[in-house]
A protein has these predicted regions:
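Short, conserved catalytic/metal-binding motifs centered on acidic residues
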Residues: 45, 115, 128, 149, ...
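Acidic/histidine-rich catalytic cores and adjacent linkers
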Residues: 1-24, 28, 42, 46-50, ...
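Short, amphipathic alpha-helical "recognition" segments used to contact nucleic acids or chromatin
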Residues: 110-122
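RNase H-like nuclease fold core
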Residues: 2-4, 58, 65-68, 74-93, ...
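Short, charged amphipathic recognition helices of the HTH superfamily
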Residues: 122-133
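Conserved phosphate-handling catalytic cores of large alpha/beta enzymes
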Residues: 267-294
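Residues in the recognition helix of alpha-helical DNA-binding motifs
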Residues: 48, 131, 152
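Inter-helix linker motif
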Residues: 255-272
């Protein structure tokens, strides 16, 4: 007689995470974490497949998907891509059904960000793989070649640059703006840094040009205006003494611009036209004058110095007199000493310029201006994350009051001229 008793169906054993004792004892903690993590990932993927397809060996006519073996995939781990076995699921009509965990872990953004961060701290594309923590031997890793790292850096920074150069700046209440240029290969990158009412610094824009000329600077300022920068109220501009930059600011802001010439650049220009034996005494005299909060007294000291140099060193005397009043602008505004020191020079933006120079010196082959712009913007954005408030920021309300008074004088000018 035929036995019609059905055999009990096999039940799927729920996945469990376990390691043998020798593995725990012999592996270091770093390798152990990776090993356990990869096992947990495989079990999580299999659990998600079971939720979609139902338990193994149990027939369910109403199930929405079925198992379809596995294939070799890749995920991001520790700054590189690693090969991982990916379970596959198919719908009744043959379409691939994605597993949520795999979709989330297969994002490329973490890898792009890691490559960008490594390069911005000075790791070259050739040494990128050596900068990463080693993985256990049983994990197959790839994607750390210099060309792969370079492609990720370009991809990540290109998206950041496009967003950075188009973002609105009208919602940043500014009291001062600094402009300076840095040479990157055959290109000049003009950088604008603004200081808001709380003393925080903001990289507002970057412009690429062949030289630090008025046209390039004007285009940068016009771009900032189109992105929301107000040109209808007075603003303090701290410049290095470049006539091209000053002309461009005057073209865009007109009389609303108050100019502060950098005293460090002024001192450097004067000393370059003097013999070395005079550097110490002239530097001391200029520093003593600029350390005063009395603009009239400082101007008198500097004019006396120019007269003493006029006979033997007329070039140095002329350099000292040129734009002298604009090196004392912040002194005349009656600001506190700490804020005067912060705004009397372009040191605040020079630190950023130095970061750009340091990183650009590592690049051996500059392909074009777009590459130079991308590197400059990436460096500027990275440096901006570490910006601190300027010293003397509590005195900014006094600066804003002085700027408002300047606006009021400009508004009364037509009335005085008519009278």
């Amino acid at each position: 007689m035929r036995n019609t008793t059905s055999k009990p169906q096999q039940k799927e054993v729920p996945p469990s995470l376990c390691l043998t004792l020798p593995a725990i004892v012999t592996e270091d903690l770093y390798s152990l974490v990776h090993t356990v993590g990869m096992q947990a990932l495989q079990q999580l993927l299999e659990l998600e497949r079971s939720q979609l397809c139902g338990p193994r060996y149990q027939h369910d006519p109403e199930r929405a998907a079925s198992r379809h073996g596995s294939t070799q995939g890749a995920l991001v781990l520790g700054g590189r891509r690693v090969r991982v076995k990916r379970p596959r699921v198919r719908s009744p009509d043959g379409r691939e059904v994605p597993l949520p965990t795999w979709e989330r872990f297969s994002e490329h953004d973490p890898l792009d960000r890691r490559a960008t961060e490594q390069m911005l701290v000075g790791v070259s594309t050739r040494k990128y793989a050596r900068s990463l923590e080693p993985l256990p031997d049983d994990i197959d890793a790839f994607g750390t070649s210099k060309s792969a790292v370079s492609r990720r850096f370009v991809k990540q920074t290109q998206a950041q640059v496009e967003q950075f150069l188009c973002r609105p700046v009208g919602d940043i209440p500014l009291c001062a703006l600094m402009l300076d240029g840095v040479h990157v290969a055959e290109h000049v990158m003009l950088i604008a840094v603004g200081i808001d009412l709380t003393g925080n610094k903001h990289v507002l824009g970057v412009r690429q040009g062949a030289t630090e000329n008025a046209t390039c600077c004007r285009e940068l300022l016009v771009d900032l205006r189109e992105r929301g920068l107000c040109t209808e109220r007075s603003l303090l501009f701290v410049l290095d003494g470049s006539k091209a930059l000053r002309k461009a600011v005057g073209d865009v802001f007109g009389k609303r611009a108050l100019f502060q010439r950098c005293r460090v650049h002024k001192q450097r220009n004067v000393l370059e036209q003097l013999p070395k034996e005079l550097h110490k005494s002239v530097r001391h005299t200029m520093q003593q004058a600029y350390s005063s909060l009395d603009a009239a007294r400082a101007k008198k000291q500097l004019e006396n110095l120019a007269r003493s140099l006029e006979v033997d060193h007329p070039g140095a005397a002329a350099s000292l007199r040129e734009g002298l009043d604009e090196t004392l602008t912040v002194m005349r505004l009656g600001l506190c000493e700490a804020l005067v020191r912060s705004l009397m020079s372009t040191n605040l933006i020079e630190n950023l310029i130095g970061s750009v120079r340091k990183l650009s010196a590592r690049v051996q082959n500059w392909k074009d201006g777009q590459m130079a712009l991308r590197w400059t913007c990436a460096t500027a954005m990275d440096a901006a994350r570490r910006f601190r408030r300027i010293k003397g920021h509590k005195g900014i309300p006094k600066l804003m009051q002085a700027l408002s008074e300047h606006d009021h004088k400009l508004e009364l000018e037509p009335q005085r001229q008519a009278a």
